[in-house]
A protein has these predicted regions:
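GHKL (Bergerat-fold) ATPase N-terminal catalytic module, capturing the glycine-rich phosphate-binding loop
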Residues: 1-189, 197, 220-221, 438
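GHKL/Bergerat-fold ATPase module in large chromosome/replication-associated machines
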Residues: 118, 136-158, 178-638
Length: 638
């Protein structure tokens, strides 16, 4: 038969199909197996109404056969096969999907039948074979026909169709693998282990058995005796047909069919984790987009979680065929710790089936999965506080980062999952903190730093403790940005005890402080002059009880923010907090400095001012520029 040309933009278009659409050559096997699965689906559907098919569901299978000597890989199915006309139209016209046409012809009611789950949409997957093969031969016999046909093509030069011999209904796709090139070892695809790996990676959950002949070696009794009279064993290697894929994914099973123990075993094997997950989340959604998901909350942080090598995201499947192994769009950033799989027959894939065409579908799934994860974590917090605190210790940073990057109702969703120390041992949520607030407490007090013990001992916290008000210790660098995003919780404003007015003074007390400030103005100006640019201003404090001094800030940049920017390589060096030195007018150190200044001993007053400033820096967790000078100052006053 004369060679035919492809009925499309011919050579140019086929070249694009082969070289431009797919990013990974190894997916050729996924595409050919998916076509075989579709062919079996069609004949299985036919068998529901045609008893002449003569095949039970358990008879269908897909066979993968490598031949190193011939350098071929054959994918054989016993599906519906193709007529000569179908060969010409389906394989001769690029981007025509016979599977999609079949699905359209069924009508909506038939598509809902659980036996039908057509994968193919675009009619280009077959041509991915040319990424690894320099020639492809298709031998097929259609159901209801006694004649088989052979389709042969070496790529863009066209194809031929001739009659062939085939005893059974179905299709054999024979790929003649290319010779090895520099940087591309095509021979690897002829190895059993490589083909099995690709099947398990991309087609593990295709509903039909994918079988291969696998060599198995074992010690058997040879029937002879050794010198000790014991049975003599010999190694025997035999070839057995082995089903490579799992077929029915665990997430497609009901709770009765798949226990939590089985799901946990799946998690450990799938994600290479020796520890049980903290939570198993199952989702079965139907509506605008139907999908199933099986999610897990790990019990510990992956080694690369907070590095640039982190690989968050869920595995994405379309009708059991893996599309992406790390789809980050399926999870809101705050839930990036979750592992698992999502499978949907309704995804609008692009032509290579390597990504989605409409992110609206992903956003819908991600929003729903976010709600499910939030619900599960809330339940865990309520029912198993110890386990939840274990989760929070591992992944609290992820929640906080998500709270900062998300906007609007996402912040409201995340805020109730966060925990903060109010003592060295006690953790509370924002809701628990507000519920426990005394009636006279109007603000949510918090302090930021890297150490709970230091934050609890801040001088600014003493007055609050005396009144029975707890302080939230925020030890993550992200916490301050999170609070700044929220502004308030349950109509209670946040108050940073290092920067904000605590709001505890009465009008009479405020006037008293202002009067003292005016009275000691000359001394306070002297302290400011002594310290120079190290502080922006000096004032008497309304926050201190027994402590002599504290360091506060004004404006939008706090000490924690300054430290954060200081730790970033290449960050601007001019981002600095506006420092304010606050002094306790009732403390004996202040009184001693005041007496020295009044007596004209400005050297002593200056030394005390410098020591107080150094103490304020140390209390705030700031380094001293000259520790030796500080030590010398202390010694002069002893």
């Amino acid at each position: 038969m004369a060679k035919k040309q492809f009925k499309a933009e011919s050579k140019k278009l086929l070249d694009m199909m082969i070289n431009s659409i797919y990013t990974h050559k190894e997916i050729f096997l996924r595409e050919i197996i998916s076509n075989a699965s579709d062919a079996i689906d069609k004949l299985c559907y036919q068998s529901l109404t045609d008893e002449n098919v003569g095949m039970a569901r358990g008879d269908f299978k897909i066979r993968v056969i490598p031949d190193k000597e011939a350098r071929t890989i054959t994918v054989s199915d016993n599906g519906i096969g193709m007529t000569k006309e179908e060969l010409d139209s389906n394989l001769g016209v690029i981007a025509r999907s016979g599977s999609l046409k079949f699905k359209d012809d069924l009508g909506e009611s038939a598509q809902e039948d659980a036996a039908i789950d057509i994968i193919g949409q675009f009619g280009v997957g077959f041509y991915s074979a040319f990424m690894v093969a320099d020639k492809v031969t298709v031998i097929t016999r259609a159901y209801g026909s006694d004649t088989a046909y052979q389709w042969v093509s070496a790529g863009a030069d066209g194809y031929t169709i001739t009659e062939a011999q085939k005893d059974t209904v179905g299709t054999d796709v024979i790929m003649h693998i290319k010779a090895d090139e520099t940087g591309e070892k095509y021979s690897t695809y002829l190895e059993n282990w490589k083909l099995m790996m690709l099947i398990r990676k991309y087609s593990d959950y295709v509903r039909w058995p994918i079988v291969m002949d696998v060599e198995q070696s074992d010690w058997v009794d040879s029937g002879e005796k050794d010198e000790n009279g014991e049975p003599k064993m010999e190694m025997v290697t035999k070839t057995e047909e082995q089903t490579v894929n799992s077929m029915i994914p665990i997430w497609q099973r009901s709770r009765k069919e798949a226990t939590d123990e089985e799901c946990i075993a799946f998690y450990k094997e799938k994600f290479h984790d020796n520890d049980d997950p903290l939570a198993v989340i199952r989702v079965n959604a139907e509506g605008l987009i139907s999908y199933r998901a099986l999610l897990f909350v790990p019990s510990k942080v992956p080694a690369n979680m907070y590095t640039r090598d982190a690989d968050p995201g869920l595995e994405l499947y379309s009708s059991g065929v893996m599309i992406m192994d790390r789809c980050t769009d399926l999870l809101p950033p705050c839930y990036a710790f979750a592992r698992g799989v999502v499978d949907s027959p309704d995804l609008s894939l692009n032509i290579s089936r390597e990504m989605l065409q409409h992110d609206r579908q992903l956003k819908l799934i991600a929003a729903n999965l976010g709600k499910k994860i939030k619900s599960e974590l809330t339940k865990l917090m309520t029912n198993d506080r110890e386990k939840y605190e274990q989760f929070h210790a591992a992944f609290g940073m992820v929640l906080r980062a998500g709270a900062v990057t998300e906007t609007g109702d996402k912040v409201d969703e995340i805020k109730d999952l966060l925990l903060y120390h109010t003592s060295e041992t006690k953790l509370v949520s924002l809701k628990e903190y507000v519920d426990a607030m005394p009636a006279e407490q109007a603000k949510i007090y918090f302090a930021c730093g890297d150490n709970v013990k230091r934050l609890l001992s801040l001088p600014q916290a003493e007055q609050l403790r005396d009144k029975g008000f707890d302080v939230l210790c925020m030890t993550s660098q992200i916490d301050e940005y999170f609070v700044d995003t929220m502004k308030s919780y349950d109509d209670k404003p946040f108050c940073n005890i290092a920067t904000d007015d605590l709001g505890l003074e009465s009008e009479e007390e405020k006037k008293e402080t202002e009067a003292k400030q005016a009275e000691d103005k000359e001394l306070l100006d002297f302290v400011k002059e002594t310290l120079g640019e190290q502080v922006a201003s000096v004032r008497l404090s309304n926050k201190l009880v027994s402590s002599a001094v504290c360091l506060s800030t004004e404006g939008g940049v706090t000490l924690e923010m300054e430290r954060y920017f200081r730790s970033m390589p290449g960050a601007p060096t001019d981002i600095r907090a506006v420092r304010v030195l606050e002094l306790n007018a009732n403390h004996h150190a202040y009184q001693t400095m005041k007496e020295a200044f009044a007596a004209g001993d400005k050297d002593k007053a200056a030394r005390i001012a410098k020591i107080l400033h150094a103490q304020a820096l140390l209390i705030a967790g700031e380094p001293l520029e000259d520790p030796a000078a500080y030590s010398e100052l202390v010694c002069t006053l002893i």
